[in-house]
Amino acid sequence: MLWWKLGRHFPDFAAMKHLLLLMILCISSVQATGRPRLLVLTDIGGDPDDQQSMIRLMVYANEFEIEGLVASSAGTMGELKYEVTKPELIRAIVTAYGGVRPHLMKHREGWPEAEWLFGRIKSGNPKRGRDFIGDGQDTEGSRWIIKCVDAGMKERPLAITIWGGQTDLAQALWRVREDRGGGGLAEFVAKFQVYDIGDQDKIADWMFAEFPGMYYILGRPEEGADRRLTTYRGMYLGGDESLTSRKWIDENVRSKGPLGALYPVETWTAPNPHACMKEGDTPSWFFFLPLGGNKVEDPSKPGWGGQFRRTAEGRYRDLPFTEGRDPRETVSRWRPEFQKDFALRMSWCVDR
């Protein structure tokens, strides 16, 4: 090439060439690693809406670096008669994703291989709550959380989305403090960001006191408020609810290959106008999805994942329900947009 010849005769040009190559490599590295890093804690195995959210996540897998899919205690507290984790439900969805991945690759780049995702499916603690955090309570899931957080940096934090309980995250934090002390804990919490759906293990306030400094969005109404008015319920309540109907799901999701065929058509929560699509956990990862419009550095800004207010303690909470303002609308207002995009991506899962 001409620049190699010029470099022999003009040393300054050779240095310029080296600098240019370095810049290209840096730009390529940024492009390769610019996607949000994501770890999911899911109580999959209770209300089928976790399976719904996981299926949707699979057709957005190219938009993230999915670093962990942790099956925490199945169901919400008291929902099931037994204590169990169900990572096999995640594996079934990833298997179906692997079947449609060749089709997805025709439309976008960056889809992880199913085998790569299998290696990131972990099991957490089948028990939940404060009594199961501490010595002897480490799990495959809590250890994996530590590993993923440690692998990152403050400038590129891990997004931890909690679809179920927080027990495995709390155990990871307890272990880090136990092994590394307060300074090590402070370094650790600076490298992740949390969006918690519902405070299902009822330990959020305890966690804030025990492990200060976390970036933490808590999707939970104020004490005594109607829990149906929580931001994340805008995924299926309010706005154009025809977009959550069985008819819409059959036409746009379940008919689109083996991944869509797994999409459950009945969920457990009432009220739900169609008792079909719920996906109450989806706003947690919508918030970190670049095309969803949210500003991670300022959760008060609008986007698919909702809007939040900063509290005096430094965490983020739902906007209050007032006359003329429903916090669910901060999600439901975007339903035509995010359902249109979901339908498009599901259409990629089949040959045309």
Predicted regions and their residues:
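Intrinsic disorder/low-complexity segments
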Residues: 15-16, 33
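Bacterial Sec-dependent signal peptides at the C-terminal "C-region" and cleavage site
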Residues: 26-34
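Sec-dependent N-terminal signal peptides
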Residues: 18-27
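N-terminal acidic, glycine/proline-rich low-complexity segments
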Residues: 33-352
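Tryptophan (W) side chains
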Residues: 3-4
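Hydrophobic alpha-helical segments and their boundary regions
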Residues: 17-18, 153
